[in-house]
A protein has these predicted regions:
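Adenosine ribonucleotide-centric catalytic and binding domains
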Residues: 1-43, 111-115
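Short, well-ordered beta-to-alpha junction loops that form the rim of enzyme active sites
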Residues: 3-4, 49, 93-98, 147
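Short catalytic/ligand-binding loop motif for oxyanion handling, primarily in non-cytosolic enzymes
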Residues: 7-10, 53-57, 98-103, 150-155
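Surface-exposed cleft-lining segments at the edges of enzyme active sites
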Residues: 8-23, 53-73
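Short, conserved loop/helix-junction motifs that constitute active-site signature segments
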Residues: 38, 84-86, 134-138
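Short, contiguous, well-structured surface segments enriched in hydrophobic/aromatic residues
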Residues: 39-54
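C-terminal capping/extension of enzyme domains
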Residues: 63-76, 103-184
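Proline-aspartate-enriched helix->loop->beta-strand connector
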Residues: 79-99
Length: 184
């Protein structure tokens, strides 16, 4: 679960090529993490919390729609609709913005309310098991990860908060989440 999809410029570029640029930092780093953790991308459903595109070419930073409470509520509702349809057994939450957006949707994610990734790590709350969003969606495992677009630049921050190698920690988080899924 990412933050948002694209800018208008990059969306049209992908549309013209009839595919995403899988060599972009986000895709390249995410696919490498999944591979290292033993997860097949074909077993994944990729989506974002915020729907829509950023105007222009910028793709980093807080999504402009985050300031609009009605838009955030609509995106929350759409996210829950996706959960009802897809019934995921696990959700990998990418980046520092998304945990606080989905935290209000489940009591099991309460440690994530208002928290940044370092706060989540200090609470040892990055992996959350048996997360229930709505009664009609099976409980699932939810894991908070560094956003892959700036993964290598930000690993050092997570290493500092954890007191251990962040890359190895994230691979282990994904592997453990998959083991939990296979046990259920």
């Amino acid at each position: 679960l990412g933050h948002d999809f694209h800018s208008e410029v990059d969306y049209h570029r992908s549309k013209d090529k009839k595919m995403e640029n899988l060599k972009s930092p986000t895709w390249r780093n995410l696919l490498n993490l999944l591979k290292e953790a033993g997860v097949e991308p074909s077993q994944c459903f990729f989506t974002n919390f915020f729907m829509g595109l950023r105007a222009g070419a910028a793709t980093t930073g807080v999504f402009p729609g985050r300031k609009d409470a009605r838009f955030v509520a609509a995106c929350s509702a759409f996210f829950l609709t996706q959960l009802r349809l897809m019934k995921p057994r696990g959700i990998l939450v990418l980046g520092s913005e998304v945990p606080s957006l989905i935290a209000p949707l489940s009591p099991q994610l309460s440690p994530w309310i208002g928290a940044r990734l370092g706060d989540i790590d200090r609470q040892q709350a990055a992996p959350r098991s048996a997360v229930l969003f709505t009664p009609d969606v099976p409980a699932c495992t939810v894991v908070s990860l560094i956003h892959p677009s700036l993964r290598h630049a930000n690993l050092r921050h997570r290493t500092k908060a954890l007191g251990q190698d962040a890359h190895a920690h994230e691979v282990e988080l994904v592997q453990r989440a998959c083991e939990e899924l296979n046990d259920n």
